[in-house]
Amino acid sequence: MSTRPEEAGNIKVGSFIVIDGEPCKVVEVEKSKTGKHGSAKARIVGIGFFDGGKRSIVVPTDARVEVPIIKKFTAQVVAFVGDNVQLMNLEDYSTFEIPMPQEEEIKSKLSEGVEVEVWEVMGRHKIMRVRA
């Protein structure tokens, strides 16, 4: 898996972390003060990048959490195969299939030959936008 460690206290809203093995975009971060016993805690809430599920964790602020490494590249739509889209990476010309995006504004603009921006997160791909 392509992740790197990061201290929980350094996580900001809008960044990405791995919660329960799923990459998530952070939507809320709460930090509690240190008490009489114990260290400060961080409560991090994230929305799943691929499934849209809401997840949260509570960890000490000095604990290490996994941050996914996101690779962004341009691909071209080659064909539609059932509920999948076949894409060709424009950097190395390799082809791969991914599920059809759920977002209607992306799905409506897809057609063969169109260039799209793809994010690769932890070995999985997602179309983020259609290039004009």
From Swiss-Prot:
Signal peptide coordinates = none
Q: Where in the cell is it found?
A: Cytoplasm
Pfam families xrefs:
eIF-5a, IF5A-like_N
Q: Which GO terms describe its molecular function?
A: ribosome binding; RNA binding; translation elongation factor activity; translation initiation factor activity
Q: Which UniProt keywords apply?
A: Cytoplasm, Hypusine, Initiation factor, Protein biosynthesis
Q: Which GO terms describe its cellular component?
A: cytoplasm
Tell me which InterPro entries the record gives: IF5A-like, IF5A-like_N, NA-bd_OB-fold, Rib_uL2_dom2, Trans_elong_IF5A_hypusine_site, Transl_elong_IF5A_arc, Transl_elong_IF5A_C, Translation_prot_SH3-like_sf
Q: Which residues carry this modification: Hypusine?
A: K36
Its Gene Ontology biological processes?
A: positive regulation of translational elongation; positive regulation of translational termination
Q: Does the keyword Cytoplasm apply?
A: yes
Q: In terms of one coarse class, where is the protein primarily found?
A: cytoplasm
Summarize the protein's role: Functions by promoting the formation of the first peptide bond.
Family membership: Belongs to the eIF-5A family.
Q: Which NCBIfam families has this protein been placed in?
A: eIF_5A, PRK03999.1
Name under which the protein is recorded: Translation initiation factor 5A
Q: Which organism is it from?
A: Thermofilum pendens (strain DSM 2475 / Hrk 5)
Q: Which gene encodes it?
A: eIF5A
